[in-house]
Amino acid sequence: MTTRTDAVKAYLLDLQDRICAALETEDGGTRFVEDAWTRPAGGGGRTRVIENGTVIEKGGVNFSHVFGSGLPPSASAHRPELAGRGFEALGVSLVIHPHNPHVPTSHANVRFFIAEKEGEEPVWWFGGGFDLTPYYGNEEDCIHWHRVAEKACAPFGPDVYPRYKAWCDTYFHIKHRHEPRGIGGLFFDDLNEWDFDTSFAFMRAIGDAYIDAYLPIVQRRKNDAFTARQREFQEFRRGRYVEFNLVYDRGTLFGLQSGGRTESILMSLPPQVRWAYDWKAEPGSEEARLTEYFLQDRDWLAQA
């Protein structure tokens, strides 16, 4: 490993530890179980899963560091000059599915790729972001989520938050449903326009911001009363989450195509989901308002 890779790996392992500790404290009912694994083709990771907690129905916080002699198609499709290069990929990826339908599902990911070829300069980039998927929308939560995102981006330039907010809205779009997965956040990939130190600092800022963005929402909503009907709607909307992850998500596709560990890759899927044929929300209901108001391209900071 290079010095750069060592530094990124040390940060990611520490980030995984800090996020797991914060989520365990907030849940208060159970702890993460760690499953350390190795990849026969090179590398390995630490998968940590929490299930049937007081607050969290299922969640996973995964660290992986994999390497190989050639990039899989999902990583080189839009960068054909990288075909045939050896690679290392490091990242932390997490998804939290709470019990309570009033608590949104959250996702975050930060990652580093480096691709090398003998006689040529290494090519590296960072990626990541975080996004929020509510089932029952709440303006206060949406504004808070985006304020934390904007604050994390601010030291790196005034255009960074709006650019990566827009990319998030575009990326987390379920094309066959013609709707977004959630209310967005930040998404960036192939980041190497700054020097390494600045790019790495930005990745750290995004990784560190996740807990500040998510925990206050959990704390506000985790004790809200909910009905069996609201729970059914949560499970119905989780189906959209599954559809996106299995059809479009780059991380899922990269993991499966590169021979990654299937259990770790699919830890993002919720434990209980339902599909109903041609289901429609009642006009004027909270369920209808989710898609009509919250799942729209919206400047949440302008709502404040």
Swiss-Prot record:
Catalysed reaction, written as an equation: coproporphyrinogen III + O2 + 2 H(+) = protoporphyrinogen IX + 2 CO2 + 2 H2O
Residue numbers annotated as active site: H107 (proton donor)
Gene Ontology CC terms: cytoplasm
InterPro entries referenced in this protein's UniProt entry, alphabetically: Coprogen_oxidase_aer, Coprogen_oxidase_aer_sf, Coprogen_oxidase_CS
Main location: cytoplasm
Family classification: Belongs to the aerobic coproporphyrinogen-III oxidase family.
Protein name in the entry: Oxygen-dependent coproporphyrinogen-III oxidase
The species this protein was found in: Pseudomonas fluorescens (strain Pf0-1)
Lineage: Bacteria, Pseudomonadati, Pseudomonadota, Gammaproteobacteria, Pseudomonadales
Gene: hemF
